């Protein structure tokens, strides 16, 4: 465990933010730097079959150290950090033996406060790693990477019985491309776990069904003084569309297993307007109903428009709820829960109000629930991780490997 913090601080020192709307994968050069660093470290540790694809997926194998027909399992984390907040020149602060109250984030007015983040009350006495208030931290998912790398070292150094352990580090998870170029056959694991969750004990095997909705509105612009019966204001049509979307089914009004419609962006002029929504729901039937609702709204608002003016709606599914795939293999969750209990952790099964690489991989034939990392408040300057949480994650990964080796 002595190198866990060192590894984490090393990884977050690299700016690995991904970038949306870029064709190339990985979308940024910084991700390549971390991938090459990890490749070198895996090779130095003596792992075999270390490969780095042209699309930035790094894979390696820790060979089994016991005989028998033990299923190969995998652990996966992503190298990119969120584009939502700067990841350049990350300057972590280490707060040992947290005693409560506000934590000043660097020099300035930014604080990490238990008033805004009550979970801090549960972390008294622990070592917190925070930002300096200017960037994100990168615990999502450099913490997961550091934990996997440390778990590999522990398995080797302590000669803990295990079967083949596959590891993979993927790019562009934060922009939805992490699993797109993942070669499940080459990975050759019976099942896997992403290490990309939050607080200690979290075990996630349910996520949203997700779709994007892009709406193009073409209007007609003339001088306002002579506009009667001629002007078709695309912005007004956009406002009417959004007024038809249920206001109480937005992200800020929902929680738990509740789905939502989210207007992510809207821009335009009288002549042309564009709207971008995302749709989320855990239930597949409700998910399909939400997509139909958007089509009905567009049809209603667009009824009776001049033929040269129109509303065009394009819906594209992004990913689906991995529950329907993971529950077909209950032992995957049983092993993870047992591993946590063996490490004095009470498992907390909760839905992901988002998605992970594991969601897509589960539908590609690799069942892949999500393990905790010990991090909180991802994608922003209030992000932090606890060293104790990271150590627990390492223990759970090691124990999962050990328990799997007992399933002969």
UniProtKB/Swiss-Prot annotation:
GO terms for molecular function: metallopeptidase activity; tripeptide aminopeptidase activity; zinc ion binding. The active site is at residues 80, 173. GO terms for cellular component: cytosol. Binds 2 Zn(2+) ions per subunit. It is an enzyme of class 3 (hydrolase). Zn(2+) 2 binds at residues 140, 174, 379. Zn(2+) 1 binds at residues 78, 140, 196. Pfam families: M20_dimer, Peptidase_M20. Keywords: Aminopeptidase, Cytoplasm, Hydrolase, Metal-binding, Metalloprotease, Protease, Zinc. The keyword Cytoplasm applies. It is found in: Cytoplasm. Its EC number is 3.4.11.4. It catalyses: Release of the N-terminal residue from a tripeptide. InterPro entries: ArgE/DapE_CS (IPR001261), Bact_exopeptidase_dim_dom (IPR036264), Peptidase_M20 (IPR002933), Peptidase_M20_dimer (IPR011650), Peptidase_M20B (IPR010161). The keyword Phosphoprotein does not apply. One of its GO terms (biological process) is proteolysis. Its cofactor is Zn(2+). HAMAP family: Aminopeptidase_M20. Cleaves the N-terminal amino acid of tripeptides. Belongs to the peptidase M20B family. This is Peptidase T. It comes from Escherichia coli O6:K15:H31 (strain 536 / UPEC).
């Amino acid at each position: 465990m002595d190198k866990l913090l060192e590894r984490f601080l090393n990884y977050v020192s690299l700016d690995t933010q991904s970038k949306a709307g870029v064709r190339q994968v990985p979308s940024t050069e910084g991700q390549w730097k971390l991938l090459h660093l990890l490749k070198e470290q895996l090779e130095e540790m003596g792992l075999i079959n270390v490969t780095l694809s042209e699309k930035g997926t790094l894979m390696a194998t820790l060979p089994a150290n016991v005989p028998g027909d033990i299923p190969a399992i995998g652990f996966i984390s992503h190298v990119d950090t969120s584009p939502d907040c700067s990841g350049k020149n990350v300057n972590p602060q280490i707060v040992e033996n947290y005693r409560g109250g506000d934590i000043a984030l660097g020099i300035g007015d930014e604080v990490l406060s238990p008033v805004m983040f009550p979970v801090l009350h549960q972390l008294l006495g622990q070592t917190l790693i925070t930002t300096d208030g200017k960037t994100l931290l990168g615990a999502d998912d450099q913490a997961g990477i550091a934990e996997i790398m440390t778990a590999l070292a522990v398995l080797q150094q302590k000669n803990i019985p295990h079967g083949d352990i596959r590891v993979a580090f993927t790019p562009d998870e934060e922009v939805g491309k992490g699993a797109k170029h993942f070669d499940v056959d080459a990975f050759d694991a019976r099942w896997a776990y992403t290490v990309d969750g939050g607080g200690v004990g979290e075990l996630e095997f349910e996520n949203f069904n997700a779709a994007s909705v892009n709406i193009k509105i073409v209007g007609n612009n003339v001088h306002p003084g002579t506009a009667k019966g001629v002007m078709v204001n695309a912005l007004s049509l956009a406002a009417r569309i959004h007024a038809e979307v249920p206001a109480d089914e937005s992200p800020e009004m929902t929680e738990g297993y509740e789905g939502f419609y989210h207007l992510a962006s809207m821009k335009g002029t009288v002549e042309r307007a564009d709207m971008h929504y995302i749709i989320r729901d855990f239930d597949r039937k409700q998910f399909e109903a939400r997509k139909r609702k958007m089509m009905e709204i567009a049809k209603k608002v667009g009824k009776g428009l001049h033929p040269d003016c129109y509303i065009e709606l394009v819906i594209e599914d992004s990913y689906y709820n991995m529950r329907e795939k993971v529950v077909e293999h209950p032992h995957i969750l049983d092993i993870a829960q047992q591993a946590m209990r063996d490490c004095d952790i009470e498992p907390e099964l909760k839905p992901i109000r988002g998605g992970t690489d594991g969601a897509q991989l589960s539908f590609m034939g690799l069942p892949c629930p999500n393990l905790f990392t010990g991090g909180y408040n991802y994608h922003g300057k209030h992000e932090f991780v606890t060293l104790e949480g990271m150590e627990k994650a390492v223990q759970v990964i090691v124990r999962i490997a050990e328990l799997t080796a007992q399933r002969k």
